[in-house]
Design a protein with these regions (language model features):
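Alpha-helical segment of the N-proximal tetratricopeptide repeat
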Residues: 37-68, 72
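Residue-level recognition of tetratricopeptide repeat
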Residues: 38, 72, 106, 140-141
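Structural marker of alpha-solenoid helical repeat scaffolds
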Residues: 68, 102, 135-139
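Canonical tetratricopeptide repeat
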Residues: 78, 112, 146-150
């Protein structure tokens, strides 16, 4: 019976939809079945703008979202991502560090700061964030795979 329960648990874990690296606005800080929790419209707008490649607009929405949201790690991760895509690397580092200070195990922030470290030729720091993801992603995750692939490409280009 214990083996059956274990198999059911494993099955359920694989069926569970883990958050995407950017932090899906529909699952970030509100329960979809709980209408009493406010939806952060600014964060949802920012997420849409990031997906559309409108990073300057996304940053404006993210600044609004940061004023009222309790899920600041996701917001700062998107801020870092948006700044990185605009080649504002110092600002990107600043926001990724803020996200990781709030949530050191944030998958998206660890992946993206690792990629940013590769962009600034700091392989050692990128590998440190890969180790964090290895610990966080017990059954593997896209963030780990993406950073691992980026590190391999970086090493092959040397």
């Amino acid at each position: 019976m214990k083996h059956f329960q274990f198999l059911v648990l494993i099955f359920l874990l694989f069926q569970f939809n883990f958050e995407v690296a950017l932090g899906n606005p529909d699952s970030s800080d509100s329960d979809s079945n709980d209408d009493s929790k406010p939806v952060n419209v600014a964060y949802q707008n920012a997420y849409y703008e990031v997906k559309s490649g409108n990073f300057q607009v996304a940053i404006k929405y993210l600044k609004q979202a940061a004023k009222s949201s309790t899920n600041k790690a996701d917001i700062y991760n998107l801020m870092g991502y948006s700044h990185r895509k605009l080649d504002l690397l110092e600002e990107a580092f600043f926001y990724y560090h803020k996200a990781l200070k709030l949530d050191p195990r944030h998958k998206g922030a660890n992946e993206y700061i690792g990629e940013l470290y590769l962009r600034t030729n700091n392989l050692k720091k990128a590998e440190e964030h890969l180790e964090v993801l290895d610990d966080v992603c017990l059954f593997g995750c896209d963030e780990y795979d993406d950073l691992k692939d980026a590190i391999e490409k970086y090493k092959n280009s040397m």
